[in-house]
């Protein structure tokens, strides 16, 4: 395929135009009066959302040069979502403003490398000031405030998340799922989460969120590494006949075995996800046994005379109501009404408590306490309902955003919301030292860019940006901000309008990182447009027209 190359000013112009297209679509969602975006789906009704990263990821521009710019800012939103779980719209708005201002300096003939150095110093100083003015989350009400703001002012969502955290602890496991009715409920069930994710991203069932979600799966627990597929065949065929998915937790899965599982998963012969077992050595064996008790299964281990190739039915497999696997974590949710499992879990907890009493090692005691907490605290499930499927999905998105923001707040604290944390932090730049005038230009660019979130929130609320910015510039109270919901100036902390420090910090860092890359780019290589309209137009099917029944599994 032939390529086209664009250089210099024309290159940056196209990239900036692409960034601006995405930023305009994402920016309208910011703040309490931000608007929703309707995203066409390949099937079913459109997705209605105010989630910045969902909007960004849905954008694919026809013009390939513009699309390069779009992908730059989509990467900002994605990275911020991965690290902080929220703040994607703020990051996008800042990145757009930073790229435009840095480009003006470049066009004016200023040494862009020195400008970048000055801007980098400014970003570091602002982040230090934001951290300095951060306050820890002290109580349930503050957790509710963070969740309320992040869910677009939905107080019910804020209170439900605060209630869930109260029941399972601030570091407890909370999941979000669809309710079977109109209601929004919190339910605490038996379950656990451990710090191991899927072995390959090809196991992800939700490509947008890159997670695997299984309802009522079987769980195969192996105290061994699996490299060849043959020992797995009997149990895989037994599970395939039931039509249920399989979660395979083992020391490791690689080679032929991993390839076969991925192939059959993609083919649809069996829904499966492979996960590495948590822990190491003897602790790994104990944690596998914990999972076995929770799921009413058995650990397949040759130490007990159980060989994998002899497992040809589902009798030794565990079960769960739901399993969610990300690249980093696995969460198992079980039915709290199963009295047999309840008794076994309570007995196991008692064994762990006795072990805690007997150990003299602080490290061992800490690890035992972690295991006890995983078994004892359970999982809080936020069940989100709605009058229609579209309404339910939109609300579920807001609940997930609010949950991410709340976790970020617990981790690093909170700052005044509404964009004022960055706005007031920019004042430290007035006394920031610089090596030359070009660096001062970079510092001033960041100072101007930090107005962008406030301006976007005011704009979305139908207010006058310059008037609000001018009013806040006079304020000596760093908590004073503009409440876009009431169109009044208020003490943001007292009004409960707060942002997680981690979200604010990450948004600025990621936005500047991408803006720096864009401004350092002087050439762009893309496919020729006409090449996309050529190619094989034959009507033949893929793979030689194989049409079997289910076709069995590929081993």
Curated annotation (Swiss-Prot):
The keyword Cell inner membrane does not apply. Keywords: ATP-binding, Chaperone, Cytoplasm, Isomerase, Nucleotide-binding. Its EC number is 5.6.1.7. Belongs to the chaperonin (HSP60) family. InterPro entries: Chaperonin_Cpn60_CS, Cpn60/GroEL, Cpn60/GroEL/TCP-1, GroEL-like_apical_dom_sf, GROEL-like_equatorial_sf, TCP-1-like_intermed_sf. One of its GO terms (biological process) is protein refolding. GO terms for molecular function: ATP binding; ATP-dependent protein folding chaperone; isomerase activity; unfolded protein binding. It is found in: Cytoplasm. Transmembrane segments: none annotated. PROSITE patterns: CHAPERONINS_CPN60 (PS00296). NCBIfam families: GroEL, PRK00013.1, PRK12849.1, PRK12850.1, PRK12851.1. Forms a cylinder of 14 subunits composed of two heptameric rings stacked back-to-back. Interacts with the co-chaperonin GroES. Residues 528-555 are annotated as: Disordered. The keyword Nucleotide-binding applies. It catalyses: ATP + H2O + a folded polypeptide = ADP + phosphate + an unfolded polypeptide. This is Chaperonin GroEL. Together with its co-chaperonin GroES, plays an essential role in assisting protein folding. The GroEL-GroES system forms a nano-cage that allows encapsulation of the non-native substrate proteins and provides a physical environment optimized to promote and accelerate protein folding. GO terms for cellular component: cytoplasm. Pfam families: Cpn60_TCP1. HAMAP family: CH60. It comes from Orientia tsutsugamushi.
